[in-house]
């Protein structure tokens, strides 16, 4: 489970990246409204949900409580990359926003490389974009009993320098993942809050 908020390093957007961010409307463009993961980063950064890892001889399985997502990631080099997305929900719906992935070990670290993303958002709170040319690297290792992840987004059409995020996760002893069973969301609460604030200010 996520152990504290994720941290991000310097974000320097290109002109195109800045334009996409400027055009972003949380109440319209957030894929979460439709139970769609906006990006792998958005899934890692979600608090209070569980994640299960399973190592098989030829692949790594990552199951997320969030949106009931399941990632099947083959071990190997670039030739292991498949055309279809690596992530589905338990109903079998594919999510290209999470990309197509392959993985390898470098010492005690698992490196997951993902490509072929659908356009989405790394940070839905403020519309930090990813695009179809985006390549990501997730570096996972255990340190001091915690899972650490460094997540790097590379796309010179969107970022002047790679955008890097850091996460840490605490191990918990739990049984099977509960079902998330997402239903289409809305931001009625946001509108109601704004109406209340406007009334107070009048």
Regions found by a protein language model. Name each.
Residues 1-202:
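PEST-like low-complexity, intrinsically disordered acidic/proline/serine-rich tracts
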């Amino acid at each position: 489970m996520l152990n504290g908020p994720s941290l991000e390093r310097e974000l320097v957007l290109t002109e195109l990246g800045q334009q996409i961010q400027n055009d972003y409307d949380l109440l319209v463009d957030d894929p979460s409204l439709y139970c769609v993961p906006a990006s792998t980063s958005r899934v890692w950064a979600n608090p209070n949900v569980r994640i299960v890892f399973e190592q098989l001889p030829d692949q790594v399985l990552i199951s997320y409580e969030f949106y009931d997502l399941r990632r099947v990631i083959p071990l190997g080099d670039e030739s292991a990359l498949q055309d279809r997305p690596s992530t589905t929900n338990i109903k079998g719906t594919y999510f290209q926003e999470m990309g197509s992935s392959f993985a390898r070990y470098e010492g005690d670290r698992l490196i997951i490389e993902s490509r072929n993303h659908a356009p989405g958002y790394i940070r839905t709170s403020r519309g930090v974009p990813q695009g179809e040319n985006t390549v990501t690297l997730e570096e996972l290792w255990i340190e001091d009993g915690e899972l650490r992840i460094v997540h790097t987004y590379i796309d010179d059409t969107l970022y002047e320098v790679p955008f890097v995020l850091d996460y840490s996760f605490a191990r918990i002893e739990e049984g099977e993942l509960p079902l998330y069973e997402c239903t289409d969301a809305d931001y009625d609460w946001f509108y109601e809050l704004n109406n209340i604030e406007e009334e107070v200010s009048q």
